[in-house]
């Protein structure tokens, strides 16, 4: 049977079921392709194949053993005659099949072996076997559990058994039949067969006559008392407790002994526990000895329903649901013996299905008292008259039937269910894992359930939530009840609690943390989705490889889709898609919206799907904006808005912008099979209802129908109401005052505030304005109480006005406002709702106070207009008064010596600074040709001008043209970075290919974007790699790109021209088309890269390497092809021709960069340039004032060189067995780290805090570690150590200090931590522990310090601290403790061996001369560093003397 089962099982599927898929390639290399070929494997053979982990080898061998071993058949007892009841339906007798005996007597060896049990399909009778002489068709088994990570294995044929099966169901008594009409739930239509309670499954092939229906439940109370003795109920109060109602006790069947029934009532807890509750309290005592008795009470686990409504069993599922229902084999009343073996039997409604044996207090209960997994039942035995036992691994359940016949029926049903379960288990991947009949849970763990003092063990398995008393019972397969999630719903209650709501009860759970609660919610929501869904459509759509991952964030197995965008998305992205609206994205579920998924729509997704969708919608997504599966909802929302509503990342069609041509192209495309073209045309604005020119087929949809293109028709129908993506254009606000009126007289109502003596920093509310009648005439602006008033409330003379400012709309309570500044340091604010009226007032006031000399300033829009004292040119002796107008980033000025206005481009200033003290400030504006000094004669209006000019001179946006620019239209950001790298990084190895620190790069780029002009890059403050990374990120993040979106594809197409002359000519044409700023930036950047590649012998960055780096950056592509890189490579190679560089300019450029490099090299060689040197304090042997040494540390100094220099200064000789080393000592952590002899010291000094210092002393344990490394084999180590996380608070107050045993494996690439699960009595059927590590760290990113700080209370004194630095330069640390000193040395030696590729100590230590400091590292200023003044503690961690006293005397 095993061979047949493995016939079609590949090694890859088998290893995946064992969670060892990483060895698939190893097996295939050794010619093992099918699972049957692995039968001869042994432990030695697996080791020879390269499988080094013993646990993995054992798992594979155990899986082989289980896969090819059939369990021994159950003992077959001798039969005895039993009278048959007439009301039991039985199949016709078959001579070849002897009757099934009761297992009460000894086995008769003369009888033939028990025949095999045929497989069962749903609730139908077992399938008949063919005779041995005929070919058996493929057997049909129940569907495998809905578990995505288990492989589906082929089913082997089962030996035949002739004759139809027997159905073991008792019919109701006469009294019970009278209750059927009122107990049927839900009521069935008249057309259905009576008593038809079987689930509606998929169509079945012809089969024997259907089974008689299941007996309707007895009308007893709805909810059971859980059969438990460990949990006492806490009375519930408040709104969270389920309501209790009084219900009538139902009469028991007349043929049975009357039983007392407890009902949910409003009685006190003591009343509920009295009387008849005693029996139930003793139910499980013998299975859990020593546990105090307590009752599971009805009120805590039930929510009563009206007595007129019968509760359907949870396994029945919702009507019409798609969840497969577990077929019921047998159900009826049985007497159950309490665990103590009492003679008082208790009546239970028992229900047996293919997976579980459950018993209830009544046949109306929704949830069982207890359930037993059929897979965990070892055998069933008869014990005396009418009694039988269900025996599991460590517990026996005793039942008593009404008669011997009924007992036999129950035993036969149980044996049949056990046999079927074992047959399925042998064929499932769970059996290969050693867990027969079990399903791996999606999530399992302990949760608090409201009303119980102890936690329950909860497991989410498939579409059910199972409740157990504890983990032990979970392993034994004996639980309390399970909840069918097809009728469940979960919702968050508070930070740690959530409710699972069903029609019968609300289960209120509490987790240990908010994160754990979120994980439980996700698992239960997944169970609900699985219960209500079918994966048929999803599996068909996932057949296309791109559809297996979310189109937006890349999450695996997405089960939602946008049917108009034709993309498959995950659940988290689907929620944000809904927020876009149906006009952008129509979201449907692959598993639940079954009616939507027609064959045509499925085929459309297979043709388009995520592959074509992302080639259009995500063609230009920069990596910095790409979504990840872990992205936050706000990030997803912004990304999806940009992607689908705005079309920010779409691939523009060549006809984009030409509506007529787009419509024509759409009409042509819909008649073909090119769906991607249709998608691109619609996404770029083609009209879906445009006129095609054919009256018979006027629309694209009609054309597609005429051409018989069903997929095109489906796509067009789904996009009938889809909006065309449109980018939100941020257009400058339109100004309403550009023409000067010939009159300066004006009147009307204005709203004004009281005059102020300082700038208006806060918004003035509408209530602060007063309505005044204002009159402008004769050079005076007067304002009155109303239009009839004669005396003005106040007036402003035009001659006293020094400045007129127009704030942006909606700055204050009124939509449009303007400010008037006077010589008396007063500010008047006026407002109006009408833009036209405000426009008129501004024009009139401006003409009233601007002299004719500066009338030209009024011909243009302005934001601020006025007069200021200034100094400029040759007249710096005295200040003059000039008129200035600010508009955007342009400051226009009219000076007395020249009547013509002169513009100043504020974003092109070389310098903008403020000089002088607070009383006499001067604004300095430096242009290439001149310097302008604007004085602050009046503080109020000068501060207004200062803020406005600074704002206008800063970057206005993210595009190139909005940046601060230089004289040649090159952005200052680009100029600063290129100039710095030219000065300091031309010879830096890997320049532009190496990345700087993320945090430093981000800070630098933010400061450059805010005000690049004020940022001066200095060699002692910024590293060249940080600057180069900032430049690359700036260019990549440009919204329109350096080559602009409109021309980007044209540039890429030009790179494919084969003729070099034609290609160069094409590049020159495209260069002219670029905007001026883009064109100047491209030339400056390519010129710089041309200089960089001239020193490729030193920096290793030739033209090809630079093209690889800058191609995707400049064209904002994903780098999948080399088109972008080819453009950059061509521009560098043809730099002289493309940019028309003459020979003289090229010669000067080469001479400049050569001189720069020579000067730096000469300065370094002569010792005149030591910008990279640090002066720091190093101690000899211990930290004392008399042992400190101040030493200059260049960038290239290693730890060995530092150690030798310190010893030279103190005249300390080095003996043969002396291992002098430089240690990094951290006083706060009470730990130290010996530096590797080749480790550079300068980077370490950068990271030292005030509580750290360097000490040169002997490494007492080095000799012992070298001896260990010389005698060991391999470069790995594994074993148990005590482990504690840095932020762990679990151990506070415990003797062990929060340290826990963990298993570690250290290899050449990483350090792995495994959680050790110990069990003195391992259960063979327990789920196998995952071999995935709990934590894993790259070995190169770890720093190991000897010692653990005392306040953590380490369990031993042999500990060390491990520090891990992430890619974002965030530090995390953990603490490890060994049991012995030698174990600590071995681990530490292995760390050093692996981290430094086997070179732990130099073979011949000598006094090496220090090399010349590297220029690329000499980028830090000369700063003296000293350690903390606090004295170091005498011990590290638990050491009582020297920090490495544990390593001495070796």
From Swiss-Prot:
Phosphatidylinositol 3,4,5-trisphosphate-dependent GTPase-activating protein that modulates actin cytoskeleton remodeling by regulating ARF and RHO family members. Activated by phosphatidylinositol 3,4,5-trisphosphate (PtdIns(3,4,5)P3) binding and, to a lesser extent, by phosphatidylinositol 3,4-bisphosphate (PtdIns(3,4)P2) binding. Has a preference for ARF1 and ARF5. Positively regulates the ring size of circular dorsal ruffles and promotes macropinocytosis. Acts as a bridging factor in osteoclasts to control actin and membrane dynamics. The lineage of its organism: Eukaryota, Metazoa, Chordata, Craniata, Vertebrata. Pfam families: ArfGap, PH, RA, RhoGAP, SAM_1. Phosphorylated by PTK6 following EGF stimulation which enhances EGFR signaling by delaying EGFR down-regulation; the interaction is mediated by the SH2 domain of PTK6. Phosphorylation promotes association with the Golgi apparatus and endosomes. Changing residue 288 to F: No effect on phosphorylation by PTK6. This is Arf-GAP with Rho-GAP domain, ANK repeat and PH domain-containing protein 1. Residues 190-199 have a biased composition (Low complexity). Residues 89-144, 173-302 are annotated as: Disordered. Residues 81-90 are annotated as: Required for interaction with SH3KBP1. The modification Phosphothreonine is found at residue 354. It comes from Homo sapiens (Human). The gene is ARAP1. Changing residue 993 to K: No effect on regulation of circular dorsal ruffle size. Residues 954-1139 form the Rho-GAP domain.
């Amino acid at each position: 049977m095993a061979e047949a089962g493995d016939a079609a099982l590949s090694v890859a599927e088998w290893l995946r079921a064992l969670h060892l898929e990483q060895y698939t390639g190893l097996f295939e290399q050794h010619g093992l392709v099918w699972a049957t070929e692995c039968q001869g494997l042994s432990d030695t053979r697996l080791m020879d194949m390269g499988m080094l982990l013993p646990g993995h080898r054992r798992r594979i061998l155990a899986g082989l053993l289980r896969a090819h071993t059939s369990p021994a058949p159950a003992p077959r007892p001798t039969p005895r005659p039993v009278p048959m009841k007439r009301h039991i339906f039985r199949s016709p007798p078959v001579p070849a099949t002897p009757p099934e005996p009761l297992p009460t007597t000894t086995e008769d060896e003369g009888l033939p072996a028990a025949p095999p049990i045929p497989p069962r399909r749903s609730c139908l009778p077992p399938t008949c076997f063919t005779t041995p002489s005929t070919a058996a068709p493929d057997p049909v088994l129940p569907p495998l559990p809905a578990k995505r990570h288990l492989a589906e294995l082929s089913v082997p044929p089962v030996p035949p058994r002739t004759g139809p099966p027997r159905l073991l169901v008792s019919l109701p008594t006469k009294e019970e039949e009278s209750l059927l009409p009122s107990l049927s739930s839900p009521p069935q239509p008249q057309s259905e067969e009576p008593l038809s309670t079987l689930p509606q499954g998929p169509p079945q092939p012809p089969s024997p006559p259907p089974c008689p229906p299941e007996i309707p439940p007895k009308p007893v109370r709805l909810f059971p008392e859980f059969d438990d003795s460990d949990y006492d109920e806490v009375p519930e109060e408040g709104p969270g407790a389920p309501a209790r109602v009084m219900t009538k006790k139902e009469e028991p069947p007349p043929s049975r002994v009357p039983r007392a029934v407890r009902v949910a009532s409003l009685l006190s807890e003591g009343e509920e526990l009295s009387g008849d509750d005693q029996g139930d309290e003793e139910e499980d005592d013998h299975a859990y000895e020593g546990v105090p008795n307590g009752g599971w009470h009805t009120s805590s686990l039930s929510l009563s329903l009206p007595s007129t409504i019968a509760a359907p069993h949870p396994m029945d599922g919702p009507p019409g649901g798609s969840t497969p229902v577990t077929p019921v084999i047998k159900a009826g009343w049985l007497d159950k013996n309490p665990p103590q073996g009492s003679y008082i039997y208790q009546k239970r409604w028992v229900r047996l299905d293919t997976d579980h044996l459950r018993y209830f207090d009544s046949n109306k209960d929704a949830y069982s008292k207890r359930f037993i997994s059929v897979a965990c039942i070892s055998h069933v035995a008869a014990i005396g008259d009418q009694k039988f036992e269900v025996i599991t691994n460590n517990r026996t359940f005793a039942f008593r039937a009404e008669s011997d016949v009924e007992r036999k029926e129950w035993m036969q049903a149980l044996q049949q269910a056990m046999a079927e379960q074992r047959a399925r288990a042998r064929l499932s991947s769970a059996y290969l894992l050693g867990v027969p009949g079990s399903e791996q849970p999606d999530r399992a763990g302990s949760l608090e359930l409201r009303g119980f003092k102890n936690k329950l063990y909860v497991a989410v398995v498939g579409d059910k939530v199972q409740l157990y008393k504890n983990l032990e019972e979970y392993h034994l397969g004996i639980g309390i009840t399970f909840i069918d999630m097809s009728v469940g719903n979960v919702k968050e209650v508070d930070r740690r609690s959530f409710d699972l709501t069903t029609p019968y009860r609300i289960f209120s759970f509490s987790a240990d943390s908010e994160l754990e609660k979120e994980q439980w919610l996700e698992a239960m929501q997944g169970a609900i989705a699985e219960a209500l869904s079918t994966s048929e459509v999803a599996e068909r759509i996932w057949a296309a490889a791109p559809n297996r991952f979310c189109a937006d964030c890349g999450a695996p197995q997405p089960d939602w889709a946008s049917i108009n965008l034709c993309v498959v998305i995950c659940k988290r992205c689907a929620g944000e898609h809904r927020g876009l609206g149906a006009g952008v994205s129509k979201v449907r579920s692959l598993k639940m919206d079954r009616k939507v998924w027609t064959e045509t729509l499925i085929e459309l997704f297979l043709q388009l799907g995520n592959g074509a969708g992302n080639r259009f919608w995500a063609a230009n997504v920069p990596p910095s904006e790409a979504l990840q599966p872990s992205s936050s909802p706000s990030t997803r929302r912004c990304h999806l808005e940009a992607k689908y509503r705005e079309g920010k990342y779409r691939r523009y069609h060549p006809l984009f912008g030409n509506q007529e041509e787009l419509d024509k192209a759409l009409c042509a495309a819909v008649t073909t099979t090119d769906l991607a073209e249709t998608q691109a045309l619609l996404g770029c604005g083609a009209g879906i209802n445009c006129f095609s020119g054919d009256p018979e087929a006027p629309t694209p949809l009609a054309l597609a129908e005429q051409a018989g293109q069903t997929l095109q028709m489906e796509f067009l129908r789904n996009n009938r109401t889809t909006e065309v993506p449109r980018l939100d254009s941020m257009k400058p606000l339109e100004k309403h005052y550009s023409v000067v009126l010939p009159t300066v007289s004006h009147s009307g109502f204005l709203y004004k505030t009281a005059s102020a003596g300082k700038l208006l920093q806060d918004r003035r509310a509408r209530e602060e304005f007063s309505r005044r009648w204002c009159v402008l005439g004769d050079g005076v602006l007067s304002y009155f109480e109303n239009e009839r008033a004669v005396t003005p409330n106040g007036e402003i003379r035009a001659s006293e006005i020094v400045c007129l400012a127009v704030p942006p709309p909606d700055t204050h309570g009124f939509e449009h406002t303007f400010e008037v500044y006077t010589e008396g340091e007063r500010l008047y604010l006026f407002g109006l709702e009408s833009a036209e009226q405000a426009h008129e007032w501004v024009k009139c006031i401006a003409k009233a106070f601007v002299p004719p000399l500066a009338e030209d300033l009024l011909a243009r829009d302005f934001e601020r207009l006025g007069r200021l004292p200034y100094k400029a040119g040759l007249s710096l002796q005295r200040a003059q008064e000039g008129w200035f107008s600010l508009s955007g980033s342009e400051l226009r000025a009219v000076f007395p010596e020249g009547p013509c206005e002169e513009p100043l481009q504020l974003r092109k200033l070389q310098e903008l600074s403020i000089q002088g003290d607070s009383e006499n400030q001067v604004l300095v504006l430096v242009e290439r040709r001149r310097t302008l000094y604007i004085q602050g004669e009046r503080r109020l209006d000068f501060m207004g001008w200062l803020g406005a000019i600074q704002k206008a001179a800063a970057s206005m946006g993210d595009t190139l043209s909005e940046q601060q620019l230089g004289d040649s239209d090159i952005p200052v950001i680009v100029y600063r970075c290129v100039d710095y790298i030219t000065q300091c990084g031309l010879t830096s190895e890997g320049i532009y290919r190496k990345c700087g620190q993320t945090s430093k790069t981000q800070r630098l780029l933010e400061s450059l974007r805010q005000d690049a002009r004020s940022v001066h890059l200095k060699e002692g403050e910024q590293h060249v790699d940080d600057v180069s990374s900032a430049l690359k990120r700036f260019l990549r993040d440009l919204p329109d790109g350096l080559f602009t979106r409109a021309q980007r594809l044209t540039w890429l197409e030009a790179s494919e021209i084969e003729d070099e002359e034609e290609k160069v000519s094409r590049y020159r044409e495209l260069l002219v088309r670029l905007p001026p700023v883009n064109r100047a930036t491209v030339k400056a950047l390519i010129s710089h890269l041309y200089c960089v590649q001239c020193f490729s012998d030193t920096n290793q960055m030739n033209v090809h390497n630079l093209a690889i780096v800058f191609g995707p950056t400049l064209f904002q592509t994903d780098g999948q092809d080399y088109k972008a890189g080819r453009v950059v490579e061509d521009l560098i190679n043809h730099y002289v021709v493309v940019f028309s560089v003459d020979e003289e300019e090229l010669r000067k450029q080469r001479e400049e960069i050569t001189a720069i490099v020579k000067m730096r090299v000469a300065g370094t060689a002569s010792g005149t340039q030591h910008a990279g040197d640090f002066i720091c304090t190093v101690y000899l042997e211990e930290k004392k004032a008399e042992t400190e040494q101040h030493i200059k540390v260049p960038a290239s100094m290693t730890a060995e060189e530092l150690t030798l220099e310190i010893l030279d200064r103190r005249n300390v000789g080095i003996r043969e067995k002396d291992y002098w080393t430089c240690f990094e000592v951290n006083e706060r952590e009470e730990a130290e780290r010996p530096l590797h002899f080749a480790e550079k010291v300068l980077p370490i000094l950068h990271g030292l805090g005030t509580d750290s210092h360097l000490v040169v002393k002997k490494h007492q344990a080095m000799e012992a570690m070298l001896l260990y490394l010389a005698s060991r084999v391999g470069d790995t180590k594994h074993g148990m150590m005590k482990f504690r996380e840095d932020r762990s608070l679990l151990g506070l107050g415990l003797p062990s200090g929060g340290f826990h045993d963990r298993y570690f494996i250290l290899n050449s690439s990483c350090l792995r931590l495994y959680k050790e699960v110990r069990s003195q009595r391992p259960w063979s059927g327990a789920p196998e522990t995952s071999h995935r590590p709990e934590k894993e760290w790259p070995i190169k990113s770890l720093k190991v310090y000897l010692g653990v700080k005392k306040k953590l209370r380490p369990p031993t004194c042999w500990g060390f601290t491990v520090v891990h630095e992430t890619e974002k330069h965030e530090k995390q640390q953990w603490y490890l403790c060994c049991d012995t000193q030698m174990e600590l040395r071995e681990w530490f030696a292995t760390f050093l061996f692996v981290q430094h590729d086997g070179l732990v100590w130099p073979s011949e230590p000598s006094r090496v001369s220090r090399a010349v400091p590297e220029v690329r590292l000499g980028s830090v200023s000369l700063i003296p560093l000293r350690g903390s003044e606090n004295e170091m503690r005498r011990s590290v961690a638990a050491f009582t003397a020297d920090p490495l006293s544990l390593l001495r005397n070796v």
